[in-house]
C-alpha cells in the first residue's frame, strides 16, 4: 500500500468540476496577471498536484520564517509544532509589481504560464513581506556564498518582496515532452495500487544512470523486497547538467535492464535548490507524497560542489544524518548508500565499504566520461549500457563535430569585421560544419530596426544579449559562429558567453581586436567618429561611451602590427589546439 501523504492528506488542488473551472477561468480574465518564472512554474505545478503537500499555496511570512529557522511550517490548529518542510516555497515580486498589479492583502491575482499565457491558478494574497536574503541563504543553503547556484539566484534573480497566499487551481502547466512519463502524485499512487506494489524505493537523480546506479537500485529493492521508482528531476537542476531530453532518453534505454516488473520510470518537474541536507529532507517529503515508502539518499545528496574557498558546501553524509533526524515524522524509510565500484575479477558491482582491502577495482569518473565522449574514446560495457552510451554520443558528439562561437570585440573600424569575414572564408574552405557570420551593425538593424545610430548603453547590452542567444542556438546545432559586434562592456560579454556556454556546450573563444582609437579614426571612411565628435551621434564607443578592454581574451591582436592572414591563422591554431578543426 502506498505511503500516507505528508501531513495526512494529499493536497491535490487540480479542479475537476467543470463549472468551477469555467468560473475561475472567467474570473482570471478580469484580474491582473503575474507571469511566472521557470522556478515559480515548477513550484506551482507541485503545489497544484499535491507534490508539495501539505502546502496549498505560496508561503506566507509566518510559514516562511518558521521554515527558514526550524525546517517546519508554522503550527496551526493547536499543533505543538508544524509539519516538517525544509525549503521555503515563495512567490517573489518587486515594488513595481506591487504598485502596478495593485497587490494587497485579500486581493486576487491570476498566475500565468509565460510559455502560452495560460491562466494556471488564482492566488488570494494573505500578506506581502520583505525577506532577509542573507539569513535565508545562511540558514537554507548553509552559506551566503554566490558560488552556490541557489544563493546566486537568490541574490541576482529573486525580487525584493514575497507574496504569500493560497491558490485555486485552474489547470496544470501543459507539457508536450514525455507526457506518458508524467504522473501526478494521485496518478502514481493509483498506478502502484494497480500493480499491487506495497513497498516502493524511490531513486532521485539529475544525471544519466549507468550500471552502478542500476545495481544500487536493484540491491536496495532486493534487500527490502520492494519495487523501484526511478524519479528523475526534469525541472531546474544544477547549471551545466545534462539536458533533460538527453537524460530521459538515457533512462528509457536503461529501463529494460531491470527484471520485468521491478521498476517504473516517472518524471518529476522539480526546481532543485541544491541545498544538500535540507534538500534531502525535501526530496523525502516529495517522494512520500508520490507514494514511495523508501527513499535512497547517497553521499553528498544534492550538493552544489565547491564554495568560494574551494571546499565542499556540505559534509559527505550530512544529508543522511538530517533525514535520520526527522525519520519518525517523515514516515519514509531512508536507504543510505555508499558509492558503488566495479570488481573486474568477479564482474560485479559492490559498495565501496564492502570491498575487501587490496581487491582490484575500476571506476570512470564524470570527468573521464565527458573526456571519452568528447574525444570519441571507447566506454566499456562494464561501466554503462550500449543504449545509454548511444544516447549520450548523439547529444555530445566528439570535438570535431561540435559547434563553437568566436566573439571578436573591438572599436568601430578596428578591423574586426574584416577579420571575421576572412575567418568565415577559411572555415568554409575546410568544410565539416556550417559557418554563420554575425556582424554587429547588420544584426542590430535586423534584430531591432528601431535602434538607429543613437544607440544607448542599455540598448548595446540588450543587442549583445540577443546576438548571444542566436550564437548559442547556432552553436548548439553544431555550427561555427563568428560574431563581431563592438561588445564594449564586460557585463555584456559575460552575458553573451553565458548564452553560448549554456546553450551551445561551452566552446567559446574571445578575440580582442585591440587596434587603438587614433588608428580607427584615421581609417574611418564613413565619418562616424567625426560625426560623434561634432555631437551628431551620441554614445559612440571610444568617444563619448566607454570601451572596457577584456582581460580574459584568448587572443589579442592589433591591425597596426598583425596582418589579417596572421590573425586568422592564430585563431585557427586556437581551434586546432581544442580539436575543433
Swiss-Prot record:
The cross-references to Pfam families, in alphabetical order and at most eight, read: APS_kinase, ATP-sulfurylase, PUA_2
Q: Does the record bear ATP-binding in its keywords? A: yes
Marked site, Induces change in substrate recognition on ATP binding, at: 337
Q: Where is this region: N-terminal?
A: 1-176
Region ranges (Allosteric regulation domain):
402-581
Identify the metabolic or biological route this protein is part of: Sulfur metabolism; hydrogen sulfide biosynthesis; sulfite from sulfate: step 1/3
InterPro entries hit by this protein:
APS_kinase (IPR002891), ATP-Sase_PUA-like_dom (IPR025980), P-loop_NTPase (IPR027417), PUA-like_sf (IPR015947), Rossmann-like_a/b/a_fold (IPR014729), Sulf_adenylyltr_euk (IPR027535), Sulf_AdTrans/APS_kinase (IPR050512), Sulfurylase_cat_dom (IPR024951)
Main localization category: cytoplasm
- Single Gene Ontology BP annotation: sulfate assimilation via adenylyl sulfate reduction
This entry's Enzyme Commission designation comes to: 2.7.7.4
One Gene Ontology term of the molecular function aspect: ATP binding
Annotated positions binding 3'-phosphoadenylyl sulfate: 441-444, 486-487, 526
Residues annotated as site: Transition state stabilizer: 210, 213
Summarize where sulfate binds, as residue positions.
204, 206, 302
Could you confirm whether the keyword Nucleotidyltransferase appears in this record? yes
What are the record's GO terms for cellular component?
cytoplasm
- Tell me the domain of life: Eukaryota
Which comment does the entry carry about domains? The adenylyl-sulfate kinase (APS kinase) is non-functional. It is involved in allosteric regulation by PAPS. PAPS binding induces a large rotational rearrangement of domains lowering the substrate affinity of the enzyme.
Spell out the subunit comment.
Homohexamer. Dimer of trimers.
Q: Which family does it belong to?
A: In the N-terminal section; belongs to the sulfate adenylyltransferase family.
Question: Mind telling me what this protein is named?
Answer: Sulfate adenylyltransferase
Amino acid at each position: 500500500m502506498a505511503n500516507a501523504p505528508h501531513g495526512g492528506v494529499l493536497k491535490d488542488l487540480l479542479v475537476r468540476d467543470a463549472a468551477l473551472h469555467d468560473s475561475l477561468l472567467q474570473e482570471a480574465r478580469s484580474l491582473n496577471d503575474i507571469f511566472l518564472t521557470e522556478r515559480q512554474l515548477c513550484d506551482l505545478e507541485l503545489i497544484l498536484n499535491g507534490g508539495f503537500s501539505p502546502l496549498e499555496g505560496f508561503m506566507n511570512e509566518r510559514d516562511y520564517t518558521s521554515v527558514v529557522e526550524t525546517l517546519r511550517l508554522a503550527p496551526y490548529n493547536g499543533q505543538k509544532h508544524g509539519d516538517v518542510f525544509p525549503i521555503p516555497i515563495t512567490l517573489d515580486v518587486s515594488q513595481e509589481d506591487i504598485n502596478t498589479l495593485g497587490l494587497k492583502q485579500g486581493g486576487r491575482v491570476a498566475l500565468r504560464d509565460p510559455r502560452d499565457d495560460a491562466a494556471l491558478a488564482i492566488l488570494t494574497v494573505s500578506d506581502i513581506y520583505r525577506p532577509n536574503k542573507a539569513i535565508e541563504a545562511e540558514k537554507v543553503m548553509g552559506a551566503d556564498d554566490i558560488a552556490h547556484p541557489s544563493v546566486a539566484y537568490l541574490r541576482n534573480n529573486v525580487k525584493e518582496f514575497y507574496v504569500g497566499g493560497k491558490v485555486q487551481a485552474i489547470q496544470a502547466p501543459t507539457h508536450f515532452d514525455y507526457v506518458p512519463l508524467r504522473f501526478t502524485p494521485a496518478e502514481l499512487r493509483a498506478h502502484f495500487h494497480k500493480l499491487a506494489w506495497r513497498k516502493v524505493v524511490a531513486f532521485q537523480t539529475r544525471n544519466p544512470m549507468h550500471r552502478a546506479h542500476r545495481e544500487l537500485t536493484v540491491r536496495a529493492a532486493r534487500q527490502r523486497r520492494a519495487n523501484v521508482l526511478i524519479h528523475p528531476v526534469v525541472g531546474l537542476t544544477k547549471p551545466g547538467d545534462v539536458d533533460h531530453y538527453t537524460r530521459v532518453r538515457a533512462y528509457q534505454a536503461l529501463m529494460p535492464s531491470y527484471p520485468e516488473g521491478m521498476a517504473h520510470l516517472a518524471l518529476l518537474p522539480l526546481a532543485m535548490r541544491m541545498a544538500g541536507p535540507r534538500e534531502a529532507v525535501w526530496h523525502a517529503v516529495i517522494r512520500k507524497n508520490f507514494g514511495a515508502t523508501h527513499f535512497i539518499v547517497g553521499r553528498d545528496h544534492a550538493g552544489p560542489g565547491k564554495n568560494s574557498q574551494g571546499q565542499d558546501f556540505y559534509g559527505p553524509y550530512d544529508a543522511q544524518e538530517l533525514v535520520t533526524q526527522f525519520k519518525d515524522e517523515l514516515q519514509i524509510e531512508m536507504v543510505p548508500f555508499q558509492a558503488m565500484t566495479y570488481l573486474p575479477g568477479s564482474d560485479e558491482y559492490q559498495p565501496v565499504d564492502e570491498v575487501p582491502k587490496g581487491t582490484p577495482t575500476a571506476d570512470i569518473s564524470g570527468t573521464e566520461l565527458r573526456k571519452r565522449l568528447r574525444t570519441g574514446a571507447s566506454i566499456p560495457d562494464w561501466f554503462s549500457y550500449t543504449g545509454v552510451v548511444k544516447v549520450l554520443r548523439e547529444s555530445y558528439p566528439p570535438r570535431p563535430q561540435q559547434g563553437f562561437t568566436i566573439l571578436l570585440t573591438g572599436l568601430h573600424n578596428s578591423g574586426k569585421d574584416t577579420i571575421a569575414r576572412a575567418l568565415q572564408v577559411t572555415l568554409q574552405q575546410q568544410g565539416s560544419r556550417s559557418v554563420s557570420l554575425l556582424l554587429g551593425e547588420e544584426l542590430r538593424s535586423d534584430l531591432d530596426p528601431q535602434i538607429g545610430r543613437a544607440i544607448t548603453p542599455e540598448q548595446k547590452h540588450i543587442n549583445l544579449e540577443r546576438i548571444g542567444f542566436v550564437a548559442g542556438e547556432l552553436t548548439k546545432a553544431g555550427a561555427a559562429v563568428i560574431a563581431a559586434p563592438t561588445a564594449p562592456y564586460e557585463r555584456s560579454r559575460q552575458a553573451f558567453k553565458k548564452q553560448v556556454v549554456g546553450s551551445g556546450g561551452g566552446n567559446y573563444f574571445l578575440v580582442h581586436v585591440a587596434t587603438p582609437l587614433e588608428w580607427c579614426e584615421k581609417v574611418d571612411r564613413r565619418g562616424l567618429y567625426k560625426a560623434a565628435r561634432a555631437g551628431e551621434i551620441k554614445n559612440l564607443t571610444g568617444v563619448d561611451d566607454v570601451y572596457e578592454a577584456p582581460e580574459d581574451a584568448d587572443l589579442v591582436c592589433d591591425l597596426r602590427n598583425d596582418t589579417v592572414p596572421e590573425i586568422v591563422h592564430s585563431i585557427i591554431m586556437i581551434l586546432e589546439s581544442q580539436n575543433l578543426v
